Regions:
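C-terminal alpha-helical interaction appendages
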Residues: 1-81
Length: 81
């Protein structure tokens, strides 16, 4: 089933990048990751794959919601829900 949205691909990309920026900053604050470690964590995560998949709708969710999922993945090695 294809997601129906009036957003352009560019707008969706901006939304995804905003989520990534916030999560990288929070990883650096909460886990004392370097910029490189935080970027590596996000871009190599299951969450990043799901964020890129428009079918999940995660790009519509807040940065905080996505960050909680990422923290689960960091702690448990996968997203639990």
């Amino acid at each position: 089933m294809e997601v129906q949205t009036k957003l352009t691909a560019g707008q969706i990309s901006i939304m995804i990048n905003a989520r990534i920026k916030d999560m990288v900053m929070w990883l650096m604050e909460d886990f004392k990751y370097s910029l490189e470690e935080a970027l590596d964590c996000v871009y190599n995560s299951e969450l990043f794959e799901k964020l890129q998949d428009l079918e999940t709708g995660l790009y519509y969710q807040s940065s905080g919601y996505n960050y909680e999922l990422l923290k689960e993945e960091v702690k448990y090695g996968r997203i639990l829900n």
